[in-house]
Amino acid sequence: MNIFDYFKKKGIDTIDSSFYSKIAMWDSWYRANVKRFHQYRVYHGTGQYERCHRKSLGMAKKICEDISDLLLNERVTITIKDETTAKFVRSVLDAANFTVQGNEYQERKAACGTVAYVPYLTNMEVAEDGSVLSADIKLDYVVAKNIYPTAWENSRITEVIFAFPKTYKRKKYVQLQHHKLEPWQDKDGNDLGYQYVIENSVVECSSGAGRDLTPAEWNAIPYFEGLAARVETGSHQPPFIIDKLNIANNVDEDDTNPMGVALFANSIDVLAKIDLEYDSYANEFTLGRKRIFVAPEMLTDASGSQVFDPDDSVF
């Protein structure tokens, strides 16, 4: 499924797909597994190639770990004056494993430029008029490749679509959660300004733009059971938090792009040089090892089977 084909079909505008190619590139450097760099082939003649893996020091991940430890570590405390509120917030963060996940997603923010935190309600008790009487609060963590801004102002994202991929019975699905502002009125028709509305849809990841599931279809899938198609928050405050590095985005020709950039976005050449020289240094030891020269008649036994391991570089 091409999610940008889906957005085009639905008439949804977001950031150009080329920027998400850059996010994928940053992620590959973060994982030290860049196509056509860490994975390459060596030609041995007569049409034979050998697949090789270039060694890496993993410096992209290392600098992301370092900035993460500076931004959110065990010395950070969240202090709220009201004790009841403080206790409630601590319980929500503990349930979301924020001490661990928060630090990890600071690292992912440094790696790809942007992350998001999306609180949501579960185990809700709802009144007849649709208002929520009680519920538990949980927290979703979203990486950059699954964040699609649809409206922004002065680099502040005001409307956004979050993608949550799931696999069920070997079929891939994605929940698209669209947070957008709509006019808000009370029951008497009085204008209350704007409120955030959350629209959910589930798409089966088939070829092209995918296939939209009906609410009845997605409720049959455990991951999406009970998912509401539309939620009116009754608030003008965004029900999500976008977290990005305080670094200007200079990798996109669109200067208004509200997404962040990787900590090492402008140092790819440096990372490549480090890994190239480290790999060359390691190869010097491999190529400098002792070699044993063997007569051709000693390479096979009486039945013609090879005696030595052809992958053993000593012989």
Which residues does each predicted region cover?
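Extended, helix-rich architectural segments
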Residues: 1-162, 168
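Acidic/proline-rich low-complexity IDRs
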Residues: 2, 11-14, 24, 56, ...
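Short linear motifs in intrinsically disordered/low-complexity regions
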Residues: 3-6, 14-17, 28, 67-70, ...
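Intrinsically disordered, low-complexity segments enriched in small/polar residues
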Residues: 9, 43-45, 56, 95, ...
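Extended, charged amphipathic alpha-helical segments
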Residues: 217-315
